[in-house]
Amino acid sequence: NPSKFFWKIMETFQARSIKDLPMTYRAVGSSTGQKEFSQQADGDYSTGLNDFGAGDIPMSASRYTGIQNAGREMVHVPFCMGAIALFHSVPADEVGTAGLKLSPCVLAKIFSGQITTWDDASIMADNPDLNVPAGTKIQVGHRRLGSSSTGGTTGYLQAKCPNDWKMVGTGVAMGTGSSITWPTLANFHEVEGSPGMTAHIADKSYAIGYLDAGHGHQRLFSEVMLKNEDAVWLTSKMAMAAVDAYGNNGVAAAGKAAVDAGDIPTDVKADWSQVNLYGKAGANTWPIVLVSYIYLNKDMSGLSADKAGLIKAFVDYVTGTKGQAMLADFSFNMIPAAMNQWTNTWTNVITKPGAVTNFVFEESTDPWNGQAETVISAKRNSYSMWKLGELDLALTSVMGRLTSLESSLNDYGIVPLHGSGTTNPKNWFGKAMVLMEER
């Protein structure tokens, strides 16, 4: 999910450095990211394939144990928080103005195959205005490979409704995790990655699926309203727009609640597999919040000075003021200060090589020093990154003007008219419409 955030930082580093800084990040999902950081082949934990891993879930208990048993240690570096949301494609005129409300137990029954139609009595109880054709099947989307969004959704359903989170027909617990066994009913659809889930919701009528909120918001999908711990119905967009007495929106509030409750380990080398931010209290708190982590080896003594220094510079930027400020552009939240332990982790926990290249950041012009090859300078850039920034600004301006124009159509007597039907008079209708618009 934070792949675009990482890519932007990596490209920024490369554009702003004299030194060649080859950096890549492969967006393959949290589960695969954990596998490739922890192992070089299935079951071989002697080393991993990557210099770092990242995921929106803590390292699983089994992989953490595998790393430990191989004589290695790892650390978790929290760097952002995000919401997992449920989106649907029920036509707006059939949902009604109040929005589609699905309680945790109803969702548990939908995703376990016990509820299969949109007009089920349990759904109608919270949605009296819902007016779908009788017997309309719910087209359920679920991820094929391991994913943090699966982990977040299943963890939430298990935490809130364990008695209903059971496989249809067998009554066996569905379980939790980044990958589980799903029902094989005809209305269940296996998708690959966030793009696959996005296509499922966009292309199938009467579909439901789970995504990180940012993906759904960008596509303007209709969002399911969930009931949070304070019994308030809301969407993730509503939660993100709300601000509590501490200045936190509904996602950040979940992080603060977890810190205040002592749910976040103070030992970055510990097993974090049970850490979650499901169902935290607060009127505007979103109930399915994930923390994103960078996974690092504790022992970096075998790395070159440049590689160790580049890892430090990258994580410095991600967890520092500049990187944290960028997160909102990707629909993520900054982590609470109490969770941001990177400086202490690098200084007191990581075993470093004898020499570490000290990459530094130049924000304001520093003559002579700014030209050093270990300086990542804001005064350098690439044309493509500059042009992209200009296009972003232009697009933001155009979208603002378009929104303003749409909202004021009626002020100018402009009335939209839409129709559909037989193809025979289409040319005649088209000519008449053009004449009316011109006159």
Question: Which residues does each PLM region occupy?
Answer:
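Flexible loop/hinge segments at secondary-structure junctions
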Residues: 1-439
